[in-house]
Amino acid sequence: MFRATCNTRDFKKVINATSNLVDEICFEVDENGIKASAMDPSHVALVSMEMPKDVFEEYEGDIQDIGIDLEALKKIIARGRGDEKLILDLDTEKNKLNVTFKSNVTRKFSIALYDVSSSNLKVPDIEYPNSVSIKAGAFVEALKDAELVNDHITLKIDEDKFIIYSKGDLNQSETVFDNSIEDDDNALAEFNMGEASRSTFNLAYLKDLTKSTAAEDLLKIYLGSDMPVKIEYEVSGSKLVFLLAPRIES
């Protein structure tokens, strides 16, 4: 049994953020809500989402593993309007997920589910020496600057600063967020440094990780030298976690 009712706009944000990296995912449903984790096809990035039952207006669920074609679901959810109620309903006999948009007009779609062999993928428990909380808008702007120079980007923590750096054959880009400077408009909300660190990442993946964020969303970024970067943020009570493997420099 699985049936849930929620706001179309909020669910759309979660699905869009998840589908930027993966095409298929397993919804692990139980009485507490929905969890899901998946690796991208190249096994460079991991995405995890958690939607507790409290984010839904109505929720009923027992233990189910539901294999979802995220691309198909994303296209259907895109047809929903923000003022419509979204109803998700599992049809176990037909092996389909029914998606209903309800206002003064009712529209219903059905998505065929895929077989799930294993759904034990979890976000690894890694201890990081450093973390920052930063406004998504400021982080995304720094990525846009770096994109003018190279397709890889270095994230550095050093001397009370969070540095986003990119270097090409001739040009370079650097954005420095200085935690020692107090400013009402400071993009850094939190800065925790245990040791100096630097890691380099594929810029396209970082853009995908943050593509669905709003400017005022707060990103929690965990960093260490040559360690995967972990990025967390919330969407209307739902939690999204992304891990991206570093590019090992010779």
From Swiss-Prot:
Gene3D superfamilies from the UniProt entry: 3.70.10.10
GO biological process annotation, one example: regulation of DNA replication
Keyword hit for DNA-binding: yes
Keywords: DNA replication, DNA-binding
Quaternary context: Homotrimer. The subunits circularize to form a toroid; DNA passes through its center. Replication factor C (RFC) is required to load the toroid on the DNA.
Function: Sliding clamp subunit that acts as a moving platform for DNA processing. Responsible for tethering the catalytic subunit of DNA polymerase and other proteins to DNA during high-speed replication.
Keyword DNA-binding found: yes
Gene: pcn
Family (UniProt): Belongs to the PCNA family.
Record-given protein name: DNA polymerase sliding clamp
Domain of life the protein comes from: Archaea
